[in-house]
């Protein structure tokens, strides 16, 4: 493999093997063909799958990039991009198609930065969460007479106001005591949400996502949780109702990573509005209930932000190349942010993987849990932290760990069974526990230690 420092690699290199995605709007059939084309051009590092159907039966396709597609490798984080949640906000959809082609192309070009990203990260790209709404908006095209035409799904529901409301539950718990993570869903949640929302919820419950971005249009700003205001205020002339999460500093940093890598988002003045550093707390801008980014944070291990990417919800075709060039580096840098903080394995005395162990950081009232393979990921900024792992039936263990800026710090926990109480405990598949084991490809073997000690450059 040639030694090509990523700092000097141009991000956009044309490959003689890959036909680039053209800068045009892609209707549903065209989108599907494009995803299949990218998959066929890079079959060893991609998997195309669907997470469900829209109201009108269109598949919600996801393109996965990984050196072992379809398999979760312990200590390798999962990250996702979601586009076109509002059917008439289309730039995210087109950017994600361009990104898919770009990752495939640059992997084949042996771009060291992209090679490392795909080898150390499992990336899931959902270009269109609302294909039915898109088709309605696309029938009008950029010259829209109705600003909201196609925004909702085929049942007329705004999908970003359709997730179970967990904020109210969390705000109550914050004052009165109660869980601060993985808040439960109501028993009837499946009957209360739309097919597209249900598909996404089942998707994010099935994979241990660590980081995510959700793409919108109509402004240019990186929006971070919470979206729902404690004061129940709605959009108005004054932004005074900031509703920070316990991870507010981290979320601001994630938002700034995107805004400052973007061509112009960080400048602040865009679309006739001003956001310092090109970022905003969601509720400080305007409060919304039942949004997707708050749901990710309160119900799963995933940290999600919302990216408003264009003043025009449906940009003209001739603007797409400029938008891609303005977003390309930001899209890559944001994916790389999943490799920060701490990660590790939670084991019992016999070195069996433990799933569902709770990882707490002193001073941050938001916990994460270990996944079904016993691995956990906790995004943190550089600093020194006191971290505790605990599981029912085991004595908790606390360590002090220093997190640096160059990549994740590996912190494993081996928990001893409590002598005073005995509880049933879940053990994750693997290490003699069954389940689907990774079958390494002999042509691309990796040293397992690389998963523990490195992240993208």
From Swiss-Prot:
- What Gene3D superfamilies does this protein map onto? Carboxypeptidase-like, regulatory domain, Zn peptidases
Question: What is the active site of this protein?
Answer: 308 (proton donor/acceptor)
Q: How is the cofactor bound?
A: Binds 1 zinc ion per subunit.
Q: Which reaction does it catalyse?
A: Release of a C-terminal basic amino acid, preferentially lysine
Required co-factors: Zn(2+)
**Assigned EC number:** 3.4.17.3
Task: Give the residue ranges for region: Disordered.
Answer: 418-457
What subcellular compartments does it reside in? Secreted, Extracellular space
Alphabetic keyword roster: Carboxypeptidase, Disulfide bond, Glycoprotein, Hydrolase, Metal-binding, Metalloprotease, Protease, Secreted, Signal, Zinc
Instruction: Cite the record's note on assembly.
Output: Tetramer of two catalytic chains and two glycosylated inactive chains.
Q: Which GO terms fall under biological process for this protein?
A: bradykinin catabolic process; protein catabolic process; proteolysis; response to glucocorticoid
* Leader peptide range in chain numbering: 1-23
The organs and tissues expressing this protein are described as:
Mainly expressed in liver. Also detected in lung, stomach, intestine, spleen and kidney.
- The residues covered by the Peptidase M14 domain are 24-338
Listed as disulfide-bonded, the cysteine pairs are 42-104, 271-311
InterPro entries, per this entry? CarboxyPept-like_regulatory, Peptidase_M14, Peptidase_M14_domain
What is this protein called in UniProt?
Answer: Carboxypeptidase N catalytic chain
The UniProt similarity line reads: Belongs to the peptidase M14 family.
> Pfam families from the entry?
CarboxypepD_reg (PF13620), Peptidase_M14 (PF00246)
Among the GO molecular function terms of this UniProt record, one is:
zinc ion binding
Presence of keyword Ribosomal protein: no
- Tell me the residue numbers annotated for binding Zn(2+): 86, 89, 216
Per the record, the domain of life is: Eukaryota
Q: Does the keyword Endoplasmic reticulum apply?
A: no
Q: Which residues are glycosylated?
A: 400, 402, 409
Function, as annotated, reads:
Protects the body from potent vasoactive and inflammatory peptides containing C-terminal Arg or Lys (such as kinins or anaphylatoxins) which are released into the circulation.
Origin species, per record, is Mus musculus (Mouse)
């Amino acid at each position: 493999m040639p030694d090509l420092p990523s700092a000097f690699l141009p991000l956009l290199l044309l490959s003689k093997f890959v036909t680039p995605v053209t800068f045009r709007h892609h209707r549903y059939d065209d989108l599907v063909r494009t995803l299949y084309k990218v998959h066929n051009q890079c079959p060893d590092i991609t998997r195309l799958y669907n997470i469900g159907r829209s109201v009108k039966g269109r598949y919600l396709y996801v393109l996965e990039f990984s050196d072992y597609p379809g398999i979760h490798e312990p200590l390798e984080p999962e990250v996702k991009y979601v586009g076109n949640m509002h059917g008439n906000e289309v730039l995210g959809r087109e950017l994600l198609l361009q990104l898919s082609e770009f990752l495939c192309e640059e992997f084949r070009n042996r771009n060291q930065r992209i090679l490392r990203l795909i080898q150390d990260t499992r990336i899931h790209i959902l270009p269109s969460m609302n294909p039915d709404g898109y088709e309605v908006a696309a029938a009008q095209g950029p010259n829209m007479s109705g600003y909201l035409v196609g925004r909702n799904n085929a049942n007329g529901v705004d999908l970003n106001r359709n997730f179970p409301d967990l904020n109210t539950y969390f705000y109550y718990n914050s004052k009165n005591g109660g869980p601060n993570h993985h808040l439960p869903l109501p028993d009837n949640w499946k009957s209360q949400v739309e097919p597209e929302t249900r598909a996404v919820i089942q998707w994010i419950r099935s994979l241990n996502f660590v980081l995510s971005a959700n793409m919108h249009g109509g402004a240019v700003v990186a929006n971070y949780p919470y979206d729902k205001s404690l004061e129940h205020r709605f959009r108005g002339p004054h932004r005074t109702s900031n509703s920070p999460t316990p991870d507010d500093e981290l979320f601001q940093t994630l938002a700034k990573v995107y805004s400052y890598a973007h061509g112009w988002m960080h400048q602040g003045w865009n679309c006739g509005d001003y956001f310092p550093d090109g970022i905003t707390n969601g509720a400080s801008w305007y409060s919304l209930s039942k949004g997707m980014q708050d749901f990710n944070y309160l119900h799963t291990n995933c940290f999600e932000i919302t990216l408003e990417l264009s003043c025009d919800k449906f940009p003209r075709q001739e603007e797409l190349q400029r938008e891609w060039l303005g977003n390309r580096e930001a899209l890559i840098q944001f994916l790389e942010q999943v490799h920060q903080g701490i990660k590790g394995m939670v084991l019992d005395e016999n070195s069996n993987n433990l799933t569902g162990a709770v990882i707490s950081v002193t001073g941050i009232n938001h916990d994460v849990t270990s996944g079904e393979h016993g691995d956990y990921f906790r995004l943190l900024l550089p600093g020194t932290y006191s971290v505790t792992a605990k599981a029912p039936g085991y004595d908790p263990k606390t360590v002090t760990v220093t997190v640096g800026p160059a990549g994740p710090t590996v912190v494993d926990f081996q928990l001893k069974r409590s002598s005073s109480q005995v509880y049933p405990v879940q053990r994750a598949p693997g290490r003699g526990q069954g389940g689907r084991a990774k079958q390494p490809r002999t042509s691309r073997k990796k040293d397992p230690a690389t998963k523990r000690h490195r992240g993208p450059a």
